[in-house]
Amino acid sequence: SKTVHNTISATTAVSGDNNTENHGSSVTTTACTYPLTVTDATGTTVRIMSDPDRVVTLNPSAAQTMWEIGAQNEVVGVSRYASYLNGTASKQNVSGAGGPSVERVLAATPDLVLVPNSTHSASPDRIAQLRAQGLILVVFPQATSLTAVIEKTERIGRLTGNCAAGDARATELQQSINRIERVTEDTDRPVGVNVFYGYTSGNNTFIDEIIETGGLENGAANAGLSGFVPITDESVVAIDPTWIVIPTSAPLPKTPAYNSTTAYQNNNIIRVETEHIQQPAPRAIYAVETILQATHPAASDEYQQLETTTPSANTSSSESSESNVSQTTARQMRSTPSGVTATQTNSPGFGIVHVVFTAIGSVIIVCIIFPRE
């Protein structure tokens, strides 16, 4: 099984008042100082002159991260798929037809725009328009692991002037993962498969690591599937998963192939909140916890005991109170995972896949979109 070991290490070089971050495979942990120069996922060098007060998030995972580090008051614009977060009703909706609305983003007058890899890939012209208007944009790489989620949490804190809070939440995530790995070290690992709208999560995806950290073997990855790809009935029969992991927003497949699996025969269906399993953001740890409780309840109890008795990360900087608020909020919202059942959310969330119906004249086009951030 995969492990997600300690990954937090300083990689920032500082020269005078110019703080330069080169985003690599590890995360930065020095204090927030400005000007800050970063190289984003497109290779673009971005210079942030001062602590941004107004932040627009073009994807819900970045918005979720801002909420998780206690910086939601700095967010002035969100996508429609971030509506599940408390307080987004007062934020500018920056979504438009087929991607972000250039006009709405400009109307929010942001100091910084956080851009997902998927949005840049799908709408490079709109991103170019925003940059041409003088806005500061940082494009994130595709998150293919829980380590990437941890790194992005720290990096968003750093970019937005919330270094201590970002570092603390990133460290807390790593500690939780370490504890889960500790309690599952000697457990059996039945085969599980994540399914949504006929697709699955193979190797080289953060959902693969969610599944495996939660105590399962990812049958799709073991079958040689990589990325977010269709899964055939033949593959389902061949894998014969013991557990099916499915987001709350997706319908449960009802085909003879699925009905024949060990998972269906034993009602081993794990419903996980969509915004937990399909967004590479801090709440992904709750997806891991849900899977762990369903598949290894004794290990889950041991983990919960460790979570409540082991001191968490905190800071001694001027931002420590903000960090502590962030951690407290995260703990308060963490309810005991529901295992094989879960409550359907009213909002669509922002999954790895969502179905968009676009009417052009009298023709309805159905598009399946794979946001990756």
Question: Predicted segment positions?
Answer:
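His/Asp/Glu-enriched short active-site or ligand-binding loop at hydrolase and phosphoryl-transfer sites
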Residues: 79, 204-229, 271
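Extracytoplasmic ligand-binding site segments that recognize negatively charged/polar headgroups
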Residues: 123-125, 141-155, 189-209
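Secretory targeting signatures
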Residues: 1-38, 47, 314-373
